[in-house]
UniProtKB/Swiss-Prot annotation:
Its main location: cytoplasm. It is found in: Cytoplasm. The active site is at H189 (proton donor/acceptor), D260 (nucleophile). This is Beta-hexosaminidase. Keywords: Cell cycle, Cell division, Cell shape, Cell wall biogenesis/degradation, Cytoplasm, Glycosidase, Hydrolase, Peptidoglycan synthesis. It comes from Hydrogenovibrio crunogenus (strain DSM 25203 / XCL-2). It catalyses: Hydrolysis of terminal non-reducing N-acetyl-D-hexosamine residues in N-acetyl-beta-D-hexosaminides. Disulfide bonds: none annotated. One of its GO terms (molecular function) is beta-N-acetylhexosaminidase activity. InterPro entries: Beta_hexosaminidase_bac, Glyco_hydro_3_N, Glyco_hydro_3_N_sf, Glycoside_hydrolase_SF, NagZ_Beta-hexosaminidase. The record marks D187 as: Important for catalytic activity. Plays a role in peptidoglycan recycling by cleaving the terminal beta-1,4-linked N-acetylglucosamine (GlcNAc) from peptide-linked peptidoglycan fragments, giving rise to free GlcNAc, anhydro-N-acetylmuramic acid and anhydro-N-acetylmuramic acid-linked peptides. One of its GO terms (cellular component) is cytoplasm. NCBIfam families: PRK05337.1.
């Protein structure tokens, strides 16, 4: 059957990526597959504000309900779009600000969340995979200053403030990487990661910031591609123990569970891409990322059989952005001007003090 543009089709369960700054014909065809739920964008997909808005508009016009468009736009070293966007501080810098002055730290975190979300929503991006609420134990190469702090109470407070800013702007939040990625040194993009701690230690420390956000209506969680063998032999993103028993039943989380990228090395030991995706879905993920490997993405779409249930679909629909400002209004908006200036001033002061990592 010929696929028609703008056709009514429920969201699926797979998030894919794009090769460049424009949507190619074969990519349009891929995005019209019923299994697809959305697109994750990277730096390679960004050339200019105008180009990005044209790209997101084209993606959103393909289907109804609209495909989700997401990006990793945390701040610091993980900010996919730079020129034309406000530079955002690393979360670790917000943690230092909090320790110097709690009130100022919380206010700044809320403003950073609002600024990040407002600018992305204005160009058609639905949500950012943020905040990182891992704890900074000082040894993790991949987490480091992406984390607010080592103290779970501080991380919970700052995460809550950042999420509130995102929510005020109309953006859903995705807390990562459950149940905690900060303790281990390994980078799961490159290698298998194992955390040998007991469940009680993880629960009393790393899970606490997630609980704080769940209490305040967290929209989504991304599990870690990390093994915790004292709890389950499977990495959290493939584990019914972590996703169903701990996250759903013990933490009372009812939002979306979004897997980390199935192409990361830590996931590849579980068979080919269709096998990995199916395992993650069966474990309890509502949405699975397949990035940086278009062959694997097409294998998944042709071989995986999965029907998104009404509850999963509702969870994903809630991730659609609800921005209040259009791009043409943004720079003339007094609130944007004030918050962009405040965040820029903070970054300048950090640079002057030599606190940048």
């Amino acid at each position: 059957m010929e696929k028609l543009l703008g056709q009514a089709m429920p969201l699926g369960c797979i998030m894919v990526d794009l090769e460049s700054t424009t949507l190619q014909p074969h990519e349009k065809e891929r995005l019209l597959d019923p299994l697809v739920a959305g697109v994750i964008l990277f730096s390679r997909n960004y050339e200019s504000i105008e180009q990005l808005q044209a790209l997101t508009t084209e993606i959103h016009q393909l289907r109804h309900p609209k495909l989700l468009i997401a990006v990793d736009h945390e701040g610091g070293r993980v900010q996919r779009f730079k020129e034309g966007f406000s530079m955002l501080p690393a979360m670790g810098q917000l943690g230092k600000c909090f320790r110097a002055n709690e009130k100022e730290g919380l206010e700044l975190a809320q403003q950073v969340g609002w600024l990040m979300a407002t600018e992305l929503l204005a160009v058609g991006v639905d949500f950012s995979f943020a905040p990182v609420v891992d704890l900074d134990y000082g040894d993790s190469r991949v987490i480091g200053d992406r984390a607010f702090d080592s103290d779970p109470v501080i991380v919970g407070k700052l995460g809550k403030a950042l999420v509130q800013g995102m929510r005020d702007a109309g953006m859903a939040s995705v807390a990562k990487h459950f149940p905690g990625h900060g303790y281990i040194q390994a980078d799961t993009h490159l290698e298998v990661a194992v955390d040998h701690r007991e469940f009680q230690e993880i629960a009393h420390k790393d899970i606490q910031p997630f609980l704080k956000l769940i209490e305040n209506g967290l929209d989504a969680v991304m599990p870690a591609h990390v093994r915790y063998p004292k709890v389950d032999d499977l990495p959290a993103g493939f584990s019914k123990v972590w996703l169903q028993e701990v996250l759903r039943q013990q933490c009372y989380f009812d939002g979306a569970i979004i897997s980390d990228d199935m192409s990361m090395h830590a996931a590849t030991e579980f068979g080919d891409a269709p096998t990995r995706v199916t395992a993650a879905l069966k474990a309890g993920c509502d949405l699975v990322l397949v990035c940086n490997d278009p062959v694997a993405a097409d294998e998944v779409l042709s071989q995986v059989t999965w029907e998104t249930g009404p509850l999963s679909h509702a969870r994903l629909i809630r991730l659609h952005g609800k921005g209040h400002l259009k791009l043409s209004q943004l720079h003339n908006n007094p609130l944007w001007q004030s918050r962009a200036s405040h965040v820029s001033h903070f970054l300048n002061s950090v640079n002057q003090q030599g606190l940048l990592v």
